[in-house]
């Protein structure tokens, strides 16, 4: 519908509402009967509200129409040569100027619970970014809600779904009536007939409500609703258990059942259903009011409450109105009430409500403060602590919130006054105001993958209604199968019947089965305005409202998300069940034909031989056509398989590497495998120019030096896009490699027959003369760095089976002195070598636990990340000295950092701004190094940041790191520590490096304010806070601190600070770090603001006494691992520099 049609449609609706209001007013003036006047007054109130809603929509369309005409007009000749605005606020010249980010319009009163989307994105020309309205699903069903537009969309979807379910229920009841009639069971037949009457009445009420909302709905493009983020959020949608309390107070303006002329009013009561089971029922009332109607009930894993109002005009009760409330919405509303009460009592405000005045003079981080430095402080005291409203933690009074009370809309007419509350059954409940504390990380358990025609089906528990893509029936709050690649969703019983290939695979269009099916008619998907409950025919999730992300086939009527259209098979007019039956028949017939053909070929070719010369020419011709080079012959299957295993080619191809022809790849693999076999090793040699030929940390010869950290690389950070850092530049390559295409430029000199792209599993030469150590390449300009593809600057990952350069060691080389930490993974223990008495921290993990939880690959990945940290001896990353294993355990021997972690120190005393800034700068450089090497950390928190005796930090615990994550790469594993998890992780979306910068923002917040920005009584409440709440700040907090936190804690990952291709440079250029000399920070030339103290080398007072008081022994393991299990850990041992 275009603008003119929408204007005409809304004008008609406005005229209709005015006529209804005038008619009701005229009727009201003609009577004094309050029983008649009351519904007329209600009708007039609703009409005025609808009239206001239509007039606002009319103004919006008219303004949009005018804006479209102005948008294409040029404002002057000077605009033609202007570049587009930068994607990030690089200059940060006007932090308080909201116009720099687009005008913000808030629906309803200002609030601190829902920040606007795209806070810092560059606005498009003529576009004004609107703030996300601050309402919950419970707000939409309240009678006095100001959000009429979202309410109409929400109720259209809900009522349509309820109508579909009730119609299915009625069909079942009618069958029951027929069966009981055939059996002669009169009592059961009468009960079923009564249920049939009630079901028909409910369908009538739902149709009336649906018609009313359809009349109010405005079909226009601007009504497009964003995808409901909570639809894909299992934590918000999972069933809840606990105690539900409901008080029914009164109802009004309902359409009561008709009674006789002289009869009294009908008896009315309210039934409360939880998951279709009647849990409570009020007393009957004739005046629509109830006194002391309190009902407490225990619910177990429930989703929704249904309240049905019944009238009893005769023998059987008749439903007259209904209301549905989700239990999760009640919990969220109570959490928000508690947060609002705490916010009002503490005096803290959100960033957009802070004053524009400058920071008070007592704050050490004012814009005019000097550079970093200062004398060491005593333990627990940090230089630059700020007393007053900013320095002190926010007061955390114990706020007791009452029940939710209000009038709620009934369908199809009327209101009901309710009081309800819900107390969750929390086994791990904790007080919100306890401050910072240790919290373990969580990781999604790896599920069993069921391969089926390219699909990787994994069982999921769905907490909402979803249809099966195969049979079409609904999965109602139950488990189902979903493909990890294309999100194809079906029943557990249906996935074995799926024979359509996973269309996300590259060879789907050449699948022989699909080519042979006669019915290959593509769907004609077109955008349509979704105003009712429709589901995607592929992934099963409900479609959002509007046209933007909704598609519908004009021929068969299938509906789909816009992003799922290309995944739907071309079976228009045929159900998926029938299509799968046909394809299954084709597959069985093809197998029979292949068996027959193979038997005949054996008979016909028993005496025939093929000329080797002809075969060789044919193979060479095919290679020439593929452009593979001069490698003769087609590789054998054995050679290709050996090369695949050697290079461990299991990870997906990186975006920066262009795909090769299959023959090209197989030939290269075969050639490499042959050369490796000839040289008698499992990897190819590093050339003299190998940038990493010196080996890993602790290799023989002089230790590798740091790359020169050139301050000139950051000279342009204030201009927004600084030069590329030297760590991303490649060392000089041989002449023949420099002339090759950038995407094929390997980090090591390959065999001369075939250049290969860098492989994750390739190994480095472990020893080389020191004279051949490469020199760092001079830093390139930003333009030069951006000229090549991203893949040309990536560094190859180390091998998980690298044995290192030192002598083999074992458990008998160490004496264990103390336990430093414990977790689900095992222990971290302090140990010393028996010969030299050197101290190390040894991480001990049980093999049985690793195998049971399918964490073998994670352990190998952790070792590779350690080797990446060892590669340049990064000053702020924990280094690995050795790995070894016994029959029952594996051991990581790491450097011992005796200063403890930052969690212990912040619990002893607040850091202050200067100390927090110092630690944040060093953490920023550590994250920068990880990201430059394709690693995201995913578990940044105070517990994992250790403090050395010289006052500098080191990041530890690489168990959740993910490799091969470059700019643009994504993953989807649900993992991290709850308070630090980014919204995209919670929403089960693909995420990239930006999750580390979100956690970095939470870390800075905790160091500055000694509390977490997102808090709750349990994990679910923390997740709710991350998705809905806006962090609060002291009213006088420095503007630079608020600015960087606001930009790092942006919910949209593509708009978050640090999410761009320059990564850490965006963070380093912020005014919060304006006094930082990054070269001095990297080389530890800045005096730390605090030095931890120990009494002796083996003093463990900086570690939690809960762990250090435990006797340092290894508990015996009773289980015995099989030889196959032990093979999983082959190649794990590694030694660098132990004596």
From Swiss-Prot:
Family annotation (Gene3D superfamilies): 3.30.60.20, HR1 repeat, Phosphorylase Kinase, domain 1, Transferase(Phosphotransferase) domain 1
REM-1 domain: residues covered: 1-67, 142-219
Database matches in Pfam families: C1_1 (PF00130), HR1 (PF02185), Pkinase (PF00069), Pkinase_C (PF00433)
Region span, Disordered: 72-132, 349-404, 590-637, 649-668, 679-804
InterPro entries xrefs: AGC-kinase_C, C1-like_sf, C2_dom, C2_domain_sf, C2_fungal_PKC, HR1_rho-bd, HR1_rpt_sf, Kinase-like_dom_sf
Keyword Transport applies: no
Any one GO BP annotation for this protein: fungal-type cell wall biogenesis
Domain C2: 225-343
Residue numbers binding ATP: 820-828, 843
Bias type Polar residues, positions: 358-368, 594-614
One function term, GO molecular function aspect: zinc ion binding
Positions annotated as zinc finger (Phorbol-ester/DAG-type): 454-502, 522-572
Biased composition (Low complexity): 615-629, 761-793
Control of this protein's activity: Stimulated about twofold by phospholipids or phorbol esters.
Family the entry assigns: Belongs to the protein kinase superfamily. AGC Ser/Thr protein kinase family. PKC subfamily.
Protein name in UniProt: Protein kinase C-like
